[in-house]
Amino acid sequence: MGRVKIKVVKRTALELFKRYPDIWTKDFEKNKKLVQALLKKVSKKFRNQIAGYLVRLVKFKEQNKLPIQYLR
């Protein structure tokens, strides 16, 4: 079982997901590089948490299980 993500990670990932909806994939490594490019000064741990949560959001979107408030 995984750990619960902190609010800052979720909020940042959601903002990136809304701002750039078409660049995210289910590939963690690709998302990690994109996060690093978009957020210049971010720690390794924070970058990885955001990239992981973005993978989760992409999977939810593909399954049409993404809550409506995430798409606004």
From Swiss-Prot:
A GO MF term: structural constituent of ribosome
PROSITE patterns the UniProt entry points to: RIBOSOMAL_S17E
Biological process (GO), any one: translation
Pfam families: Ribosomal_S17e
Keyword set, alphabetical order: Ribonucleoprotein, Ribosomal protein
Any one GO cellular component localisation term in the record: ribosome
Highest taxon above the source species: Archaea
SS bond partners: none
PANTHER family on file: 40S RIBOSOMAL PROTEIN S17
Family: Belongs to the eukaryotic ribosomal protein eS17 family.
Protein's recorded name: Small ribosomal subunit protein eS17
Natural source organism: Nanoarchaeum equitans (strain Kin4-M)
